[in-house]
């Protein structure tokens, strides 16, 4: 807890989110913009709100987020992970329900590197029989 803010760091792919929550009326600000302006896809908004809806805290916290790196999906996942950790910092009794939903575990999948002699990570050059 930092002052009256609860803190959580979230990560997904190459995105990192620093999330601060405090009691309020449900405003979510991401990098200085309202969440609806920052995330253009409806699925991204849904991903971010999942831990709040699961714990029935949708309108009880003001959330301030700084997120860097990655694309829209990675950033949304990082924000969700950060909100989850901040909620656990606020109330540890929420951890079992968040954990069964799979929000506490960091998604460890990363982009596989490109290999020498191949076009992509696994895609080989086109083979010509003749």
Curated annotation (Swiss-Prot):
<dbReference type="InterPro" id="IPR020568">
    <property type="entry name" value="Ribosomal_Su5_D2-typ_SF"/>
</dbReference>
<dbReference type="GO" id="GO:0003735">
    <property type="term" value="F:structural constituent of ribosome"/>
</dbReference>
<dbReference type="Pfam" id="PF00380">
    <property type="entry name" value="Ribosomal_S9"/>
</dbReference>
<keyword id="KW-0687">Ribonucleoprotein</keyword>
<dbReference type="GO" id="GO:0022627">
    <property type="term" value="C:cytosolic small ribosomal subunit"/>
</dbReference>
<dbReference type="InterPro" id="IPR023035">
    <property type="entry name" value="Ribosomal_uS9_bac/plastid"/>
</dbReference>
<dbReference type="InterPro" id="IPR000754">
    <property type="entry name" value="Ribosomal_uS9"/>
</dbReference>
<dbReference type="InterPro" id="IPR014721">
    <property type="entry name" value="Ribsml_uS5_D2-typ_fold_subgr"/>
</dbReference>
<dbReference type="GO" id="GO:0006412">
    <property type="term" value="P:translation"/>
</dbReference>
<dbReference type="InterPro" id="IPR020574">
    <property type="entry name" value="Ribosomal_uS9_CS"/>
</dbReference>
<keyword id="KW-0689">Ribosomal protein</keyword>
<dbReference type="GO" id="GO:0003723">
    <property type="term" value="F:RNA binding"/>
</dbReference>
<comment type="similarity">
    <text>Belongs to the universal ribosomal protein uS9 family.</text>
</comment>
<protein>
    <recommendedName>
        <fullName>Small ribosomal subunit protein uS9</fullName>
    </recommendedName>
</protein>
